[in-house]
């Protein structure tokens, strides 16, 4: 029987020999893993034993094989918790140290402690939880004084750990990375993994700064400077939470960078244009951010105010284009208090009247300053002035302002005015006749010659005929009104749009009190042409009826002037009519005499300018 056993087991030995040689000659991956878990001394012993076994015969090898111990050895139990070579053991060890502590008067249920550990492993999703037996072994190694107790009633009893409790303040353990399996030592994993992330962030910041320097033409040392520059230049919104955090946390860092910016400022030659801004930094009118971004305020002002604009203005000095732009801009002076600002001398306001759209024209009229003096050519500027309130006159009634702006008192003593004060302004260059009757030139017919005008009017009505006017001598006492009618027919279109103002005396009983005359508007010297068309249809404001009769008297008033229609350009301005309205008026005889002389001179001097009006 004893011999049969070796024979029966001899195939095993024969079958085992080739794998043994294969293990020695061709190590497999299993051998490599086992060598990694065995110490060097054990490996040396195994190699010595193998050398001795190779000298054995087959029977000796079989005997050695049968004598080898079977089952797990006791050395495995001691090596598993102590060595902590497995990742699961390491996570369990860390969790117990971070969440549990010794306390003699406290008991914790075993199942609740294990459930908390299992949830922790599930949250990591990178390790498997240990079994309850292995977890209990690790707890006993960490806390050797704990005892296992069974607490609770019959059927509801639970096993508890007596002598430990949960920590009230749990510190957050360093979480491992996702690539811990590649590292040989699991403890170094959480410390090594942040390094690649930091390098990645630094590389990204460097690339962003390089891109910002090329785009913005400025130099930036960090990504923080880029963000501050974007905020100060209003390129992004400054109302976000990140913008407020950046402004609040960057004040201390800006003060440290101030000396470096002071040394870089003089190289760009910006101290001269900024000299005015350094003198009074505390009285700057604009906010510091906007002012320094535009003018590049100096480092002295930054050091005093300690605002968050240090880094933005310093890179701006490196750009030549920005420097040229700043040099062209006007210097921004500080705002002084209102009490210290000297009052600016202001000239008294000039009340210029609102002028109408009429063109300004200059004409030369022969005028006589005194009765009997030769007429002199005086240039007159025609302007249209606004309505002026009535000026108090020496007459009994208040003055009324005609549309042209002149104020003419209605008193009896001021009714007769000379030729210089009755010619209205020339409104838009309309031609007018030079033969002006006395009733229109002086404003009203003189009371002394009302009877004479009635006699001449009766005689002229009897001799009025149609056709061309006949040439008469200058000394005849009669005149034909036919030229006046033809002139009125030619200028009827223009006379229809000329404003007229008629006024008469308020309550006087003489024959001239109710006379109707046109106001001194532009074309007041149209003469009998416009007076004839306006006299019949216009009702006097004073309510007098004889206005049309005096208009007809004015048509036949001038016997010494030949019947010609001659025109002149321009008219008297209202500037010369104002003194006449205030009281500087001539007497009636002097006004009639000046009128006759003026009409004669103007007719003779302007005769060659109107060939159409010359009779054949």
Swiss-Prot record:
<keyword id="KW-0010">Activator</keyword>
<dbReference type="GO" id="GO:0090575">
    <property type="term" value="C:RNA polymerase II transcription regulator complex"/>
</dbReference>
<keyword id="KW-0007">Acetylation</keyword>
<dbReference type="GO" id="GO:0043565">
    <property type="term" value="F:sequence-specific DNA binding"/>
</dbReference>
<dbReference type="Pfam" id="PF02257">
    <property type="entry name" value="RFX_DNA_binding"/>
</dbReference>
<dbReference type="GO" id="GO:0000122">
    <property type="term" value="P:negative regulation of transcription by RNA polymerase II"/>
</dbReference>
<feature type="region of interest" description="Disordered">
    <location>
        <begin position="391"/>
        <end position="616"/>
    </location>
</feature>
<feature type="region of interest" description="N-terminal domain">
    <location>
        <begin position="25"/>
        <end position="90"/>
    </location>
</feature>
<dbReference type="GO" id="GO:0000785">
    <property type="term" value="C:chromatin"/>
</dbReference>
<feature type="compositionally biased region" description="Low complexity">
    <location>
        <begin position="13"/>
        <end position="29"/>
    </location>
</feature>
<dbReference type="GO" id="GO:0001228">
    <property type="term" value="F:DNA-binding transcription activator activity, RNA polymerase II-specific"/>
</dbReference>
<dbReference type="GO" id="GO:0045348">
    <property type="term" value="P:positive regulation of MHC class II biosynthetic process"/>
</dbReference>
<dbReference type="InterPro" id="IPR039779">
    <property type="entry name" value="RFX-like"/>
</dbReference>
<protein>
    <recommendedName>
        <fullName>DNA-binding protein RFX5</fullName>
    </recommendedName>
</protein>
<dbReference type="Pfam" id="PF14621">
    <property type="entry name" value="RFX5_DNA_bdg"/>
</dbReference>
<feature type="compositionally biased region" description="Basic and acidic residues">
    <location>
        <begin position="424"/>
        <end position="434"/>
    </location>
</feature>
<feature type="region of interest" description="Leucine-rich region; critical for dimer formation and for interaction with RFXAP">
    <location>
        <begin position="62"/>
        <end position="66"/>
    </location>
</feature>
<keyword id="KW-0539">Nucleus</keyword>
<dbReference type="GO" id="GO:0006357">
    <property type="term" value="P:regulation of transcription by RNA polymerase II"/>
</dbReference>
<keyword id="KW-0705">SCID</keyword>
<dbReference type="InterPro" id="IPR036388">
    <property type="entry name" value="WH-like_DNA-bd_sf"/>
</dbReference>
<keyword id="KW-0225">Disease variant</keyword>
<feature type="region of interest" description="Disordered">
    <location>
        <begin position="1"/>
        <end position="29"/>
    </location>
</feature>
<comment type="similarity">
    <text>Belongs to the RFX family.</text>
</comment>
<feature type="modified residue" description="N-acetylalanine">
    <location>
        <position position="2"/>
    </location>
</feature>
<keyword id="KW-0238">DNA-binding</keyword>
<keyword id="KW-0804">Transcription</keyword>
<dbReference type="GO" id="GO:0000978">
    <property type="term" value="F:RNA polymerase II cis-regulatory region sequence-specific DNA binding"/>
</dbReference>
<feature type="short sequence motif" description="PxLPxI/L motif; mediates interaction with RFXANK">
    <location>
        <begin position="173"/>
        <end position="178"/>
    </location>
</feature>
<feature type="compositionally biased region" description="Basic and acidic residues">
    <location>
        <begin position="276"/>
        <end position="293"/>
    </location>
</feature>
<dbReference type="GO" id="GO:0000981">
    <property type="term" value="F:DNA-binding transcription factor activity, RNA polymerase II-specific"/>
</dbReference>
<comment type="subunit">
    <text>Homodimer. The RFX heterotetrameric complex consists of 2 molecules of RFX5 and one each of RFXAP and RFX-B/RFXANK; with each subunit representing a separate complementation group. Interacts (via PxLPxI/L motif) with RFXANK (via ankyrin repeats); the interaction is direct. RFX forms cooperative DNA binding complexes with X2BP and CBF/NF-Y. RFX associates with CIITA to form an active transcriptional complex.</text>
</comment>
<feature type="modified residue" description="Phosphoserine">
    <location>
        <position position="10"/>
    </location>
</feature>
<feature type="modified residue" description="Phosphoserine">
    <location>
        <position position="185"/>
    </location>
</feature>
<keyword id="KW-0597">Phosphoprotein</keyword>
<dbReference type="InterPro" id="IPR029298">
    <property type="entry name" value="RFX5_C"/>
</dbReference>
<dbReference type="GO" id="GO:0000977">
    <property type="term" value="F:RNA polymerase II transcription regulatory region sequence-specific DNA binding"/>
</dbReference>
<feature type="compositionally biased region" description="Gly residues">
    <location>
        <begin position="534"/>
        <end position="546"/>
    </location>
</feature>
<feature type="compositionally biased region" description="Basic residues">
    <location>
        <begin position="463"/>
        <end position="473"/>
    </location>
</feature>
<dbReference type="GO" id="GO:0045944">
    <property type="term" value="P:positive regulation of transcription by RNA polymerase II"/>
</dbReference>
<feature type="DNA-binding region" description="RFX-type winged-helix">
    <location>
        <begin position="92"/>
        <end position="168"/>
    </location>
</feature>
<dbReference type="InterPro" id="IPR036390">
    <property type="entry name" value="WH_DNA-bd_sf"/>
</dbReference>
């Amino acid at each position: 029987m004893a011999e049969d056993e070796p024979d029966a087991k001899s195939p095993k030995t024969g079958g085992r020999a080739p794998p043994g040689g294969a293990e020695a000659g061709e190590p497999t991956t299993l051998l490599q893993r086992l060598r990694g878990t065995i110490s060097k001394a054990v490996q040396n012993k195994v190699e010595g034993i193998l050398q001795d076994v190779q000298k054995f015969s087959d029977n000796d090898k079989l005997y050695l094989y049968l004598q080898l111990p079977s089952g797990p050895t006791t050395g495995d139990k001691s090596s598993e918790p102590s060595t902590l070579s497995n990742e699961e053991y390491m996570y369990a060890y860390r969790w117990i140290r971070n969440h549990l502590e010794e306390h003699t008067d406290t008991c914790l249920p075993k199942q609740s402690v294990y459930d908390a550990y299992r949830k922790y492993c599930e949250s990591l999703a990178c390790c498997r939880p240990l079994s309850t037996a292995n977890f209990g072994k690790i707890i006993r190694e960490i806390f050797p004084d704990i005892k296992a107790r069974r607490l609770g009633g019959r059927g509801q009893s639970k096993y508890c750990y007596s002598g430990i409790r949960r920590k009230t303040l749990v510190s957050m353990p360093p979480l491992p990375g996702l690539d811990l399996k590649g590292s040989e030592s699991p403890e170094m994993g959480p410390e090594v993994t942040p390094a690649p992330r930091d390098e990645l962030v630094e590389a990204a910041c460097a690339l962003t700064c390089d891109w910002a320097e090329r785009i913005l033409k400025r130099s930036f040392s960090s990504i923080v400077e880029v963000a501050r520059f974007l905020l100060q230049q209003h390129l992004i919104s400054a109302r976000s939470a990140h913008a407020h955090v950046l402004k609040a946390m960057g004040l201390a860092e800006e003060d440290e960078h101030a000396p470096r910016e002071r040394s870089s400022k003089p190289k760009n030659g910006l101290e001269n244009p900024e000299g005015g801004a350094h003198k009074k930094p505390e009285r700057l009118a604009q906010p510091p951010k906007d002012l320094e971004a535009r003018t590049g305020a100096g480092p002295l002002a930054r050091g005093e105010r300690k605002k968050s604009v240090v880094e933005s203005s310093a890179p701006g000095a490196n750009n030549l284009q920005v420097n040229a732009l700043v040099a062209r801009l006007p210097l921004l002076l500080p705002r002084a208090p209102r009490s210290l600002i000297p009052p600016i001398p202001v000239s008294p306001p000039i009340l210029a009247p609102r002028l109408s759209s009429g063109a300004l024209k200059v004409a030369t009229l022969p005028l006589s300053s005194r009765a009997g003096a030769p007429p002199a050519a005086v240039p007159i500027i025609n302007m249209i002035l606004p309505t002026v309130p009535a000026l108090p006159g020496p007459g009994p009634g208040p003055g009324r302002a005609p549309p042209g702006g002149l104020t003419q008192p209605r008193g009896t003593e001021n009714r007769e005015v000379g030729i210089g004060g009755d010619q209205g302004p020339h409104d838009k260059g309309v031609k007018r006749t030079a033969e002006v009757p006395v009733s229109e030139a002086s404003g009203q017919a003189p009371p002394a010659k009302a009877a004479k005008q009635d006699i001449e009017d009766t005689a002229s009505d009897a001799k009025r005929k149609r056709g061309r006017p006949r040439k008469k001598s200058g000394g005849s006492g009669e005149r034909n009104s036919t030229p006046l009618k033809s002139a009125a027919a030619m200028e009827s279109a223009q006379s229809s749009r000329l404003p007229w103002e008629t006024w008469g005396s308020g309550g006087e009983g003489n024959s001239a009190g109710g006379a109707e005359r046109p106001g001194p508007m532009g074309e007041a010297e149209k003469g009998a042409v416009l007076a004839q068309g306006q006299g019949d249809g216009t009702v006097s404001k004073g309510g007098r009826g004889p206005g049309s009769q005096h208009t007809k008297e004015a048509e036949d008033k001038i016997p010494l002037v030949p019947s010609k229609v001659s025109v002149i350009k321009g008219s008297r301005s209202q500037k010369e009519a104002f003194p006449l309205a205030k009281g500087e008026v001539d007497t009636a005889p002097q006004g009639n005499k000046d009128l006759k002389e003026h009409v004669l001179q103007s007719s003779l001097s302007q005769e060659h300018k109107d060939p159409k009006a010359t009779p054949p």
